[in-house]
């Protein structure tokens, strides 16, 4: 995964190289300063020679100034490299996500992808900057300081080299303990983001049902989960610090003790002891910096794996080698089609991680999940075969969860079938260029989405170069023109995030108009008039008949009144087609359709009458 992620830093190879070079020059200046300090003490102060004090003092100031310049340049190049790396990663991830099918997105979840695009990439950015600065600085400082220590006093230097081994062991143990915890932390971030996203997008429903306390409890639990894991990880990192400080203080006492004896014995000068003390502290501080780098790498390794999973994910749906670039007509044919959603073992395993179980129980649980994953999957659609002629209006009705939305998703190839084939315009949908197919099969999904911007900007999602007249005509067909003209700025009215400043029915009509602007061969409305009154619903269908008679129209609805005048009606039940015919034919031959009709007309006849 590291190779997959790091290839996006290649564009910033030069600043990534220059930063360590300037860092090395800064370190070289800094590590020589204690050596000059010894000259000031021994050849200047102790020798009562102020000329040497000035000479070596000015040399020290010059070296400090150079160190500052080199350090600043190193920091600038490191910042450019790390932020550029993060920018490229975000671009690469976004481009990759755009290629994902619905199935790929289901695999990661929306909240999981948001966490990866924000928190995980920021972790990698910080780690990369630390690596090209501190990971270079610490070893160079350590090596040069060790050489200088041996040069000044090999006897005293040899006494503390064993300390390096102890610190290295502590750092290794820290990595082994904290890596698994940080992996869990970022999974909990996904759950936290999901909770926030769900609550904010449904805030009106939350308030309408007075569920604020329930949502707060759910959110607090997600926050507490992240808090507990972070405390667990941080406490283990902090626990190492007292041990390291104890080692450092012990080394200081040893230096003072043995250094004092060597000075008294005439084997060492005061200046040498001072510089030796500084160099030994440099070595110890370098070891601590290395430990910090290990911690940062530990945190970022989990992020690298999560980013790598997205970048290496193979899209389930791709363009064929020689795609068909034209959809000739709106004919649709389902040939013995079966489909099932992929079983996501990863999500179930993640849910199980919240439970405290012993190793044996965890292993048994994983084995059981794997067996379930290998077992035959429940089919959402099974053995569907039917023909729809170009220009026909098809109604689609059935109970909740019977596969209506899945059925229409296969037409625009949002998912691929498991068995059989779906044909549009006499070609298998797998033969088409994806953009070509989806431009000609316009879908208004069950969950309508509007984006921040003006009404015109939202409409032009359907056709980027649409004129104002084309937009108005589409809105007239969707019965949206009237309420748009009543808005203060008309078609230039700003749509707030998520379309929060328009009603559900208005949002649906805008989405229908957006789809109509594409002038598709096939128009699919997935329960897209559910928030529209029956009179407006009837006017929209009338506009379809008069303005787009050659377009194949598939209308999913829970209301018989919305589809009763369709050329044919599909009745679905638990993934199969239970009936296919006109309203009159189904009333005579299909008990399910007849029952739905009688329930609606007798139970709410006034509402459904046109």
What does each of the following model-derived ranges do?
Residues 11-13, 99-103, 119-132, 136, ...:
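An intracellular "coupling" helix at the cytosolic face of ABC transporter transmembrane type-1 domains
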Residues 33-37, 58, 74, 78, ...:
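Hydrophobic/aromatic residues in alpha-helical transmembrane segments
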Residues 11, 15-28, 39, 69, ...:
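Transmembrane helices of ABC transporter permease
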Residues 47, 83, 91-115, 119-121, ...:
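Short intracellular "coupling" helices and adjacent cytoplasmic loop segments at the cytosolic face
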Residues 327-610:
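ABC-type nucleotide-binding domain
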Residues 48-53, 62, 144, 148-162, ...:
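Helix-loop-helix
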Residues 1-33, 37, 45-61, 74-78, ...:
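Membrane-integrated ABC transporters
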């Amino acid at each position: 995964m590291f190779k997959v992620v790091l290839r996006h830093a290649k564009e910033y190879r030069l600043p990534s190289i220059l930063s360590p070079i300037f860092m090395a020059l800064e370190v070289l200046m800094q590590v020589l300063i204690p050596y000059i300090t010894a000259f000031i003490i021994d050849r200047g102060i102790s020798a009562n020679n102020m000329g040497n004090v000035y000479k070596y003092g000015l040399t020290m100031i010059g070296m400090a100034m150079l160190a500052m310049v080199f350090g600043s340049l190193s920091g600038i190049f490191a910042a450019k490299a790390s932020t550029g790396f993060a920018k490229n990663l975000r671009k690469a991830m976004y481009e990759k996500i755009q290629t994902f099918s619905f199935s790929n997105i289901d695999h990661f979840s929306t909240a999981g992808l948001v966490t990866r695009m924000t928190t995980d990439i920021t972790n990698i950015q910080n780690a990369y900057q630390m690596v090209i600065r501190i990971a270079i600085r610490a070893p160079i400082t350590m090596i040069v300081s060790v050489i200088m220590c041996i040069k000044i006093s090999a006897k005293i230097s040899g006494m503390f080299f064993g300390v390096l081994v102890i610190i290295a062991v502590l750092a290794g143990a820290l990595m082994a303990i904290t890596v698994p915890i940080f992996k869990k932390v970022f999974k909990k971030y996904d759950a936290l983001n999901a909770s926030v996203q769900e609550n904010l997008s449904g805030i009106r429903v939350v308030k309408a049902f007075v569920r604020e306390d329930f949502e707060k409890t759910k959110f607090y639990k997600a926050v507490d989960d992240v808090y507990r894991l972070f405390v667990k990880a941080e406490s283990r990192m902090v626990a190492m610090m007292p041990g390291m400080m104890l080692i450092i203080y012990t080394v200081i006492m040893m230096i003072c003790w043995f250094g004092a004896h060597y000075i008294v014995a005439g084997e060492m000068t005061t200046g040498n002891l001072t510089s030796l003390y500084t160099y030994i502290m440099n070595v110890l501080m370098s070891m601590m910096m290395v430990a910090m780098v290990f911690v940062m790498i530990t945190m970022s390794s989990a992020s690298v794996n999560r980013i790598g999973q997205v970048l290496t994910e193979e899209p389930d749906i791709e363009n064929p080698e020689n795609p068909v670039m034209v959809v000739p007509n709106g004919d649709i044919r389902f040939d013995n089609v079966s489909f099932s959603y992929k079983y996501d073992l990863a999500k179930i395993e993640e849910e199980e991680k919240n439970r405290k179980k012993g190793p044996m129980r965890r292993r048994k649980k994983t084995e059981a999940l794997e067996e379930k994953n290998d077992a035959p999957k429940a089919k959402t659609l099974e053995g569907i075969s039917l023909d729809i002629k170009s220009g026909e209006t098809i109604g689609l009705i059935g109970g909740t969860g019977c596969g209506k939305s899945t059925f229409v998703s296969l037409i625009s190839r949002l998912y691929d079938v498991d068995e059989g084939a779906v044909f549009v315009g006499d070609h298998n949908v797998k033969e088409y260029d994806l953009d070509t197919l989806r431009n000609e099969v316009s879908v208004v999904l069950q969950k309508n989405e509007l984006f921040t911007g003006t009404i015109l900007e939202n409409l032009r999602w359907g056709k980027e170069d649409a004129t104002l007249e084309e937009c108005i005509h589409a809105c007239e067909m969707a019965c949206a023109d009237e309420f748009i003209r009543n808005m203060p700025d008309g078609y230039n009215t700003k749509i707030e995030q998520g379309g929060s400043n328009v009603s559900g029915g208005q949002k649906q009509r805008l989405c229908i108009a957006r789809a109509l602007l594409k002038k598709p061969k096939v128009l699919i409305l997935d329960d897209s008039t559910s928030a529209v009154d029956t009179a407006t619903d009837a006017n929209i269908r009338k506009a379809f008949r008069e303005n787009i008679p050659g377009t194949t129209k598939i209308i999913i609805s829970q209301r018989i009144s919305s589809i009763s005048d369709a050329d044919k009606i599909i009745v679905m039940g638990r993934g199969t087609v239970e009936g296919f015919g006109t309203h009159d034919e189904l009333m005579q031959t299909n008990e399910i359709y007849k029952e739905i009709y009688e329930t609606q007309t007798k139970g709410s006849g006034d509402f459904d009458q046109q």
